[in-house]
Amino acid sequence: MRVAKPELKNKKILITGGLGFIGSNLAHKCAELGAQVTIFDYLDPRSGGNIYNVEGIRDSIKIAFHDILNFDQISEFVTDKDIIFNCASSTSHALSMREPWIDLDINSKGVINLLEAIRRFNPQTRLVHIGTSTQLGKLRYQPSDENHPEFPRDIYSANKSVSEKYVLIYCRAYNLRGTVVRLSNVFGPRASIHSPEFTFNNFFIGLALQNKNITVFGQGTQMRNVTYIDDAVSALILASQTDKTESEVLFAVSDEHLSIAEIAKLTVEHIGSGRVTFVDWPLGRKNIDIGDAIISNKKIKKLLGWAPQFDIRTGLDLTKNYYQPCLEKYFP
């Protein structure tokens, strides 16, 4: 299937959480395609936002330093937008278990605020909401798909599951034009590479860039999809361009299935520094590990003609080239 070039020129686009990893890369691409981009971001350090992420486009976009938990503020910014990408999220699995109320506020109440604002003030806008593969929990069949039941194992994943349902309920009850795109282990430029609180493979990249040990529990045999950021961004944009995806849930993941040990070793190889060490599982950690997590992308390929363009090796090379000149910007 031929994929048409997205039509974003002069479109008014709002990106909540636009200073974070996925949101900022989305902002760069939308600006490149001629859109009028507004970023709405509180810059909460727990969510991985970084003002340096918009270096190079800051003069061509608008940034509103506001909180999605403030209904009046988010309402003001949804009113005239053609497309809204909801990337605002507290993204740490571990933090969600330590501070569940914070995760509940951002990942559930924040989404309700956004949906209510859209319903009241701009019901014709196009909404793309980001979900996550961890909503599924331990997989009952593989490759899993959008019909797999959800058994989340942490508060973050549970709230992402609930917020996805909020989006679908509002779409069906109020005819909002929303789509959920679930992502899995996205890596690349502009990520939070300094902390294990965020995606494990981006943390691996940060360790390798500092020539440190990458620690893998057990033998690291658990299989994962890893998706380069440009592929994730292209999926999000394509999902906003057609009514075929309205009220749908789509997995946008890579075709590659690699073990955690393989991901660690390839990271060291392509970054050119660091080393991989294997240690016994910490007490209690193995009990919450979900094992293999292989996801199918057949639905999004069929509906949108989307397909990943970057393998992990190419993605790691591009990631290294991005971080090396500006590494200090990503380590607080």
Language-model-detected regions and their locations in the chain:
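Short, surface-exposed alpha-helical segments at coil->helix boundaries
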Residues: 48-51, 164, 202, 261, ...
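N-terminal Rossmann-like NAD(P)+-binding domain of SDR-like oxidoreductases, especially those catalyzing
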Residues: 1-183
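NAD(P)-dependent short-chain dehydrogenase/reductase
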Residues: 141, 168-224, 229-234, 238, ...
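Short, solvent-exposed loop/turn segments at secondary-structure boundaries
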Residues: 98-99, 140-141, 155, 191-196, ...
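Short-chain dehydrogenase/reductase
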Residues: 104, 153-161, 195-202, 226, ...
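Active-site proximal helix/loop that lines the substrate pocket
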Residues: 89-95, 132-135, 185-191, 221, ...
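C-terminal substrate-binding subdomain of Rossmann-fold SDR/epimerase-dehydratase oxidoreductases
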Residues: 1, 26, 32, 212, ...
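CheY-like receiver
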Residues: 76-77, 117, 207, 235, ...
